[in-house]
């Protein structure tokens, strides 16, 4: 009877400990996804503010595409972490700080910027050097009229560096994805799967088993509607579960995702 009682006690302890750890992990995930989202928005706002300062300088001249403003692009690009700066006229003709010229009137970021809004593109492959970049843009105002757009671009790898990489002590990673599930940026690597820009995360996660009545279909629906959530995934080679937490970034319908390995009661007791 004594051995039976000890056995029942150990089982009870394990169940309670696991629930406690699970609850703690979920709360940590929710906190971290909020931190990650706020951190990224803060960095992007710094870039926007910098571009708006340059745009004000450019707007002081009588002509948008004069030599003085082209020189301003070159000077200011050297003092920013953005790869390229470009000045775009109302017809979509863009002049870059390296002297390249092309028309971008078909781009979404041009249409948003010329309408007087800050803009951020989805990842685009550069026709100049074939690098994949995102473009930030701000309108250039002169007497309350939009006379052009000032844009800066950064490599998706640099966008990834804007994410915290120390949230999980090596037990997880962060993602920025489109509402369709395409990877925009990431930090950290899963041990059982290599991440690639543009990859559809649902293709990988659909091979996993969901816990607690959730489904990948539910996650897809939440992405499409811009809603936050958390799902527990099983089916990994090491036998452990993963938590996938996600929330809208508030920019471009992008989602911020965190994936974290669920600790066992033993891990929780020794951490």
Where in this protein do the model-derived segments appear?
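Extracellular/periplasmic ligand-binding regions of membrane signal-transduction receptors
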Residues: 34-35, 39-70, 87-98, 202-203
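Extracytoplasmic/periplasmic ligand-binding sensor regions of membrane-associated signaling proteins
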Residues: 79-81, 85, 90-166, 170-173, ...
């Amino acid at each position: 009877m004594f051995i039976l009682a000890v056995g029942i006690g150990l089982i009870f302890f394990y169940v309670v400990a696991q629930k406690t750890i699970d609850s703690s992990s979920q709360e940590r995930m929710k906190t971290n996804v909020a931190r990650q989202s706020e951190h990224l928005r803060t960095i992007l706002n710094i870039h926007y503010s910098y571009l708006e300062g340059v745009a004000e300088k450019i707007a002081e001249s009588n002509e948008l595409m004069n030599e003085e403003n082209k020189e301003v692009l070159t000077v200011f690009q050297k003092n920013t972490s953005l790869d390229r700066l470009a000045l775009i006229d109302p017809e979509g003709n863009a002049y870059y700080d390296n002297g390249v010229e092309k028309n971008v009137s078909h781009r979404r970021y041009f249409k948003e910027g010329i309408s007087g809004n800050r803009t951020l593109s989805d990842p685009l492959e550069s026709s100049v050097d074939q690098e994949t970049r995102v473009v930030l843009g701000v309108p250039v105002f002169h007497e309350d009229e939009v006379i052009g757009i000032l844009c800066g671009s950064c490599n998706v790898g640099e966008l990834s560096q804007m994410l915290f990489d120390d949230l999980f002590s090596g037990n997880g990673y962060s993602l920025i994805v489109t509402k369709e599930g395409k990877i925009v940026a990431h930090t950290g690597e899963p041990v059982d799967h290599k991440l690639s820009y543009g990859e559809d995360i649902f293709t990988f996660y659909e091979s996993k088993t969901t816990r607690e009545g959730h489904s990948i279909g539910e996650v897809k629906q939440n992405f499409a509607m811009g809603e936050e959530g958390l799902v527990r995934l099983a089916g990994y080679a090491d036998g452990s579960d993963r938590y996938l937490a996600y929330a809208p970034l508030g920019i471009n319908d992008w989602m911020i995702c965190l994936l974290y390995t669920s600790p066992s009661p033993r891990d929780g007791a020794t951490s």
